[in-house]
Amino acid sequence: IHDIDPEVMKTLAVNFFINASLIGWSKQEENRAKYNCNVPWAILLDPTSACNLHCTGCWAAEYGNKLNLTFDEIDSIIQQGKKLGVYMYIYTGGEPLTRKNDLIRLCEKHNDCVFLCFTNATLIDEKFADEMLRVKNFIPAISLEGDEVSTDSRRGQGTYQKVVRAMKLLHEKKLPYGISSCYTSVNYEKITSDTYYNSLIDMGAYFIWYFHYMPVGNDAAPELLPNPKQRETVYHRIRHLRATKPLFAMDFQNDAEYVGGCIAGGKRYLHINANGDVDPCVFVHYSNANIRECTLLEALQSPI
């Protein structure tokens, strides 16, 4: 934390630990009882389905690339969420940074919230890094599949070097960022190796979020889904790394034991896609509510 800009550190500490966790949690509990429904700790939003890459097995690709939530629609979701006690917002996509100007405006308007953004990082430049430094409440989670060969094979030739440049820029600006890594039946050993982990530490990452490959979306490849034995191997590797390395690791699927099982359906989070459909999970594309036709509370009270 000594390498993070002190004003950014202060803002994130207040927004995450006080607003999202202390104040927010008590408001969520109150509203769960009041409205007899789940109220999430975090809301995932797709600002857009557009993306500048075309990655193998992308769960978001089935939406196409022409859907968008407007600035006012995202702003309304955040306003409604804060009334329920939600101060943590996570952007997925598409590539959220194709809407970088709107995202910065939302950071400015809702300076009491934390905004985490899953991004391929290829659109992070010095101007945007300076804007992040100014608003202080935006954290990228950068997608990497391991080394250069593994990343480029899924995300396109030259992607890895663009990502590394973005990581170096963020580190130079003293901005916190993390990594999002998808492990498969092919890369699960490499992506949890000491070599990979140490390289991320050296480049200034502060956390890593692991997801196992889900065969949905564009050009899905079921053979890449890790088998139970491979998932068990990753389970133990992540716990070893978490205990021995200064880079905090989270495993989206295998850490369910720490949060009482599945967190979807508004229990701890929900997903709103770029068409406004409210899904229980980013990997479960079923919805009977659209944020353009109902309030956030009404969506939470719906059967799905």
Describe each model-derived feature in a short phrase.
Residues 51, 147, 284-287:
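A generic "binding-loop/recognition-motif" signal
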Residues 52, 137, 293:
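ATP/adenylate-binding site constellation spanning eukaryotic-like Ser/Thr protein kinases
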